[in-house]
Amino acid sequence: MIRWLHISDLHLNDGNFSSARLRDELPSFLKDKRMKCDYVFCTGDIRSANVRPNSFTEDMANYMRNICHAVGAPMERLFIVPGNHDVNIFAEGREDAIKHILPYDGYYKPDYGHIDTVDLEKLQSGKEDFVGFLSEFYDTDRVGLYKDCNNPHFSIETPDFNVLHVDTTLVYSQSGKATDLLVGLEKLYTVVRKLNQEKPTILLTHYPITSLLQEERRLLSNVLQMNNVRLWLAGHEHDHNLQKMKYLDSLQAGELHYETDANATILIGEYDSENYQCRVCAYTWMGRVSNY
């Protein structure tokens, strides 16, 4: 049995009393329940961009190490994608590039899926701090995958899965809208078509598929189906959620941050490679009455 931990929306620099508690209690809970995991998946928002200070810190890197240690997963089995809060939306040239790309007034057409290289470079500038954070615990080759502005999406093949990293924050803009996003299908397809079809694929990203531009979503859904991608792991909405979209199971973890109208939730997934069965359990922090 292969097991993974899925966490999301940590917002580690936003530390109210209950948020600090639930984060501190998570490693102990995982150890006490002997939740050994082979992988840890983090679907973004390590920090809160709208809280000052909002820089990535060594304490944040140490928290990721503590989580991996609690479930017995080595750091190279930690897989992360950026969330919208991890991106500097005010990076020079980024907003202009987004306006140039978006299909309402820009050149992007989902049927072609093309984003100009010069615009990809400007979009990448918003991830410099995030990439610096990853360098605290990843080796140079791993960090290099996130630095490659010409290839914003990539896959890492493990002994058990293809872990397909998809950057759905690519054109997240200063407007804050998250219903007309796009991924650049041309670049994504170059990765998807090379997936090892002998292994299951886990797609890791920040936003649910419903956040994409309608035509982008339709075309991507078809590509995923044709290439046997069945599991979409995301976050963003600060609540655990399962959306069944035909062949695709879209699972969202909750947050590791306390809010009145949201759920601080982690997901534990299990996959039996012999009978191809998968099970996912949600654990929610109930701080007023108990632990997780």
Name every feature range the model reports, one short phrase each.
Residues 1-59, 63, 67-78, 88-89, ...:
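N-terminal active-site segment of His-dependent metallophosphoesterases
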Residues 1-5, 151-165, 200, 244-249:
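Beta-strand-turn-beta hairpins that frame and shape the catalytic cleft
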Residues 6-8, 38-45, 73-84, 166, ...:
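Active-site neighborhood of phospho(di)ester-bond hydrolases with catalytic His/Asp-centered motifs
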Residues 11-16, 47-51, 81-95, 173-174, ...:
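Active-site environment of divalent metal-dependent phosphoester hydrolases
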Residues 59-178:
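Extended active-site neighborhood of metal-dependent phosphoesterases/phosphodiesterases
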Residues 117-120, 212-281:
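Conserved beta-sheet core of the metallophosphoesterase superfamily
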Residues 169-231:
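Active-site-proximal segments of metal-dependent phosphoesterases and phosphodiesterases across multiple
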Residues 204, 280-291:
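Short, solvent-exposed aromatic-acidic interface loops
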